[in-house]
Amino acid sequence: MKAIAYNNFGNTDVLQISEQAKPSVQSNQVLVRVKAFSINPMDWKIRKGEMKLMSGSKFPKNTGADFAGIIEAIGSSVSGFKIGDEVFGIVKNLMKEGASSEYVVVPSSLIWKKPEKISFAQAASIPVVGTAAVTAIEKMGKINPQTTILVNGATGAFGMFLLQLLKQYGAEVTAVASSKGIEYAEKWGANKVIDYTKENVLLQKTTYDIVIDLSGKMGYKNAKAIMKPKSLFLNPTPLPIEIPLSLLKNLFTAKKHVIVLSSPGTNYTDVLLNAVKNGLDIEVNKVFSFEQYKEAYQYAEKGGYIGKIAIEI
């Protein structure tokens, strides 16, 4: 089968389509013919060597975490699925299995039936950022209509899910986005939108109970200027060194630095599936063909787009 892989750290030039053995299923696994997969920041962070502590330096490495497709084979102990089911899910180890391939084998616990109302590209956009959004809301603690929340970088894939899921809590949500993202942020539930091309959010006088930085550009040190005396800064894109440092810093301040790390689970996915049934908007900004993979990753890494980027096979 064909799969996107790389043999050394670097930019998109190191990516290549390689021939790999078609995987076979074990008793608790399913074989999925991939119809679409999506791109996440961790794909290029690992490829560029920014996460060596986690990824190691052994090659070749595959890439891609979440996918959608059709089941072609089922292990003997798998229940609840059948051959021909349209599903979406996440691979167990993106550097080994990699969703960016014609076939993936995954435990049945890491796939879910695709709602008929959404496309394969939309379904493949759910697992990583969707579960991250649910995790972030859990980290926020008790949210009510008096809770003020600032979402920086609100119209990327993470923000798309987060803004819509936050609506049910009635919190006062301010989104920071570009001029072209204002319409989307409002549609997804933001009460107020700050256009970062016209206003520096760090220079305003308003302070917040919760600040979440989805862009990775604000940082805890800067965010403290717009945080209430007792507040939370949520960081879903931490550098490895920030994880232990945040624990130490939190001992000495009421402005807490909270690291958001997530992994898909049944409870999280149930929340997302219910949201899809209730009209959750999944904006796929652009869909590329498998042969356009380098162009797709270059486009994704450049940023500045609304929603998610997907590749169809």
Could you describe each region identified by the protein language model?
Residues A124-D195:
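Mid-domain Rossmann-like dinucleotide-binding core that forms the NAD(H)/NADP(H) cofactor-binding site
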Residues G75-S77, V173-Y184, K217-Y220, P240-I241:
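Short glycine/proline-centered loop/turn elements that form peptide/ligand docking sites
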Residues K22-S38, M51-N93:
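Glycine-rich beta-strand-centered segment in the early N-terminal region that forms part
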Residues G265-I313:
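C-terminal hydrophobic helical "lid"/dimerization subdomain
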Residues K217-N278, I313:
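Glycine-rich phosphate-binding loop and adjacent beta-alpha segment
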Residues I90-L150:
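NAD(P)H dinucleotide-binding glycine-rich loop of Rossmann-like/cofactor-binding domains
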Residues L203-I210:
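A short acidic, Gly/Pro-enriched loop at the edge of an enzyme's catalytic core
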